[in-house]
From Swiss-Prot:
Glycans are attached at residue 94. It comes from Arabidopsis thaliana (Mouse-ear cress). InterPro entries: CLE9-13. The gene is CLE11. Keywords: Developmental protein, Differentiation, Glycoprotein, Hydroxylation, Secreted, Signal. One of its GO terms (molecular function) is receptor serine/threonine kinase binding. The keyword Signal applies. One of its GO terms (cellular component) is apoplast. The keyword Secreted applies. The modification Hydroxyproline is found at residues 91, 94. It comes from the Eukaryota. This is CLAVATA3/ESR (CLE)-related protein 11.
Length: 99
């Protein structure tokens, strides 16, 4: 004959596992809420560090690259040589790819 488990031991194991599950769930919720609170404080700390840092060298580089983009490096003759606007033909009429 096979030995049947007692109903009390089965209920004891179920209650023990459920208590363990609830404990783990509460501890997980507490650690994630603590991390979120510490993340908010660390953002304030990062703002303080950023306020003490001098960003002007980076801003000067940004202005210089914008000026280089705005100034034309090619003359009109060279530009006309590469992109010959006089000989450019644009097709007109219906698009042959659309039926």
């Amino acid at each position: 004959m096979t030995k049947q488990p007692k109903p009390c031991s089965f209920l004891f194991h179920i209650s023990l596992l459920s208590a363990l599950f609830v404990f783990l769930l509460i501890s997980f919720a507490f650690t994630t809420s603590y991390k979120l609170k510490s993340g908010i404080n660390s953002l304030g700390h990062k703002r303080i560090l950023a306020s003490n840092f001098d960003f002007t060298p980076f801003l000067k580089n940004k202005d210089r690259t914008q000026r280089q983009r705005q100034s034309p490096s090619l003359t009109v003759k060279e530009n006309g040589f590469w992109y010959n606007d006089e000989e450019r033909v644009v097709p007109s009429g219906p698009n042959p790819l659309h039926h």
